[in-house]
Structures are given as structure tokens and as C-alpha cells.
Amino acid sequence: MYSNLPVIPIVIPLLFASITIFFKNNTFIQKQITLCASILVTISAIFNIFKIKKHEILILEMGDWKSPFGITLALDGLNSILVLTSAIVFLATIIYSSKTIDKYSENSFFYTGILLIMTGINGAFTTGDIFNLFVFYEILLMASYLLLLVGIKKEQLKSSISYVLMNVFAGSLFVISVGYLYTIVGSLNMAYISKTISSLPDKRGLYLVGLVMIFVFAMKGAIFPLFTWMNRAYAAPPIAVSIIFAALLTKVGLYSIIRTYSLFYYESNTIKYFLLSLGTISIIVGCIGAIYQKNLKQIVIFNIIISLGIMVAATSVLNSKAIKGVILYSINDILLKAALFTMVGIIIYICKVKNIKKCGLINKYPLLGWTFFITTLCLSGVPPLSGFYGKALIIQGFVEDKQIFVGVIVTLSGLIVFYSLIKVFLNIFYDNTNKSLELKPLPKILIIPVLSLLVIAIVVGLCSNLLEPLLEKSTSTILNSNKYIELVLQKG
């Protein structure tokens, strides 16, 4: 279906970001503008979901330039789900930041950066051509550089160097691979590329480009062995920034892998086993890091690596159960990782500790403690909570593809996730032997985003049968590239 709806989640934050610049010295107005933009994007994303349930895919050809020559925005089940989930996380983050970001950081274009990174993320999810995927990557990266330096502490400056260098290198490789792809196909429209390459007699050059692209997306998604930059970059900035980085930025890399692999490289066993290997090793490395880490932020970061590894490995097998599982698992993971990082921020705010210490918070803050415990169960994949259903489908997908070893690794990773987070729970919340620790009072507004994210994640898991029609459409569009090609090139 032809529609202007796909551009709305991109235009709203971009427009509101430009408005915040005129109120540089009034952070209260900036905050209200950002909150308003986030609410509007959430509403538009919900509306888009209902439209896609009817029409399967929404197409917008910018300037009425026809595919494959013009800029195309294509919103289907997968990216509409990601746009909505991202909007919810942004909304929760803005509420959380209202009490945790200091005035100096707020005056450093914090809210402008939030809106620009929202623009880049939504654009990367929605674009239908490979070059504008690069453009939106650059928008979100420029915004992330700004947010990474909010407050300008020494630790942030150090972490920003590796982050910027990594992205400059990845961006250069991406441009080179896009240019080479254009010389082969003669277009940058994803649907047209997919249609054209299926008839190419010699695909070796194409698969080489594919490996480079997967390498770039793996670097941006922090997949093994390209995740080392993440430990500093995600831990250094204020928690409000880390929430967005941890929950969303890596998912843009994952989405790019899913989209390009399913459209361009699904016939290549080389790329399949390359992805499967990267994903499996990422799970193992993430598990090792999560076990041995004592720093609260680093424990969450290594848990992110585990979940990314699971989703990348599942994407490689490209069957119905695995892809459906990845979509459901990604919704759960985005919401719960955001909730987990928010709770880590609250713990640091209350106790002024960065490592696991005996704080005994359960007596004074029981709601926070039990929310952390339930989040731990969800992320571990304990049935019937939200993390179970997506992971169960992923394991079934591995079994169907005869990747039993990987399925076992994914199953065992749930135990490691549980262990890594329960040690935080037992020490931070239950052990109260440290009597000398002074606890700051907790502003009640900080618990609202945590509870909201957790409740939404649990509802999504328990009511996943209600999402079945949308999940089926999303999976069908990914697995049946001909359907996506037909809908995009014929304008729905």
C-alpha cells in the first residue's frame, strides 16, 4: 500500500530536534519538546502496526520518484515492530533522565541528541535502499558522538576515541561495499538488488561484498570479535544515554544483518556459517564475561553480547521458527535490557557504587528489588515469562536446521544469564551486612519507566498469541523475498 505513514517516525524527531536548538538555554522546554516528540512517534508507530496488519507493507517513494531510482521507505512487520519498541524505550528514557541528568549535561544539547538519534534509528529501520541505510547510520552515529560526550568526563573522552575510530573504519568499509554493489547491480534499492542478483551467473564477487557488509554490521552490532569498543563506550556516558545505546544501537546492526542477509545472501552457505559461527562464539564470550565481571554496567553489557549472539545465530538458519523467535526475542530483549540498565542506574544513584557490593536495598526498596528479580527471570528465559517464548522458538529453529550444538549453547546461556544477574540481586538487595552505607532517597518517578518496560515485556510474552498474525506476516516477508520485492517495486 502506498502511504506517507513510513516517514512520520523520521520527520517528527528531526523536526522537533531543530526546534530544541532555539531553546538552548531553557532545558525545561527542551525536555517537554522531546517528551512530546516521543509520544507522537509512539502513537504513529502504533497506528502503523494496525495499518500493516491490513496491508502487510507500507511504501513511500520520496518525491514520487519510482523504484528503483528514487528513495524508497518500506515499512513491514519487522521494522514497524522495532520502531514501536524503540519509541517506547525512548519515552521511558526521557522520563528517567528527567531526574538523573545534571544541568550541565542537559545544556550540552542532550535532548537534541536524543531526538537526532531517534531520527537515525527510525530511518535505518525504515529505509528501502542500501545507501540511505548508510546515511541514517551516520545521523545516529553523529548523535551518539554528541551523547557519548555529554558531561565531558575524562572516562567519556577515552571511550569516545575507540568508538569514533571503529565507526569511521566501519563507515569506510560500508561505502566501499555499497559502491561495489552498485557497479554489479546498477541500483541501491534493496528490493531491486535482490531481484537482480538472483539472476547473476557468477555470485562470487557479490558474496565477497556480502561478507564485508556482514562484517560492518557485526562491528556496529558488537558481535564477536568486534565488540571490544562497546565495553567502554556503553559504560562511560550517563545511564540515560547507556540505556539507548544498549537497548537500541546494537539492534540497528542486527536489523541490517537480517534485512540484507534475507534479501541478498540467503543462498550462500559461506555467509550462513559465518553468521552462525560469529553468533555462537558471541554467546560463549558473553557468558564468560558475565560470569567474571563485578562491575554492574559491564555485567549488563556482556548480557547484551549473549542476546545478540543468540539472535545473529538464529538469523543464519533462516527458517520460520527461528525468524519468528528472533522477532519476539528482540522485542523482549530491547524492553528488558532498557529496564535492566535503568535499574542499574537507580542502584548507582541510591548507593553510589559501580561494582557489586552488599547494599541491602530490599528492606527499603522492595518494589525495586522484586522488579529486578522478575526482570532476571524474564531475561533468563524462565517459563512462562516473556523471555521463554522467543528463545523456545529459536531453539526449535536450530533443531529444524540440525544445529543441535548451537541449540544446547543457547539453552545453557539462560543459566549463565540467571547466575550473572542473581549474584547482583543477592548482593545489592539481600545482603545488608554493610551497615555504614548511606542510601540516597529514590525519587518515585524513576521507578515508573522500569515498571512500564517490564509490564509491557511480560504482556508481550504472555499474549504472544495475539501477535501471531503480525509475527506471521513479518516472518513471511523476511523468508519470502519475492513477496517483498513485488510489493516494493510495484508500490504495494
Name the predicted role of every residue range.
Residues 365-367, 414, 418-492:
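Cytoplasmic/organellar membrane-interface segments at the starts of transmembrane helices
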Residues 92-102, 108, 118-133, 144-392, ...:
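Hydrophobic transmembrane alpha-helices and their helix-loop junctions in integral membrane proteins
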Residues 28-38, 158-168, 365-369, 444-452:
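Alpha-helical transmembrane segments and their helix-start/interface "positive-inside/aromatic belt" motifs
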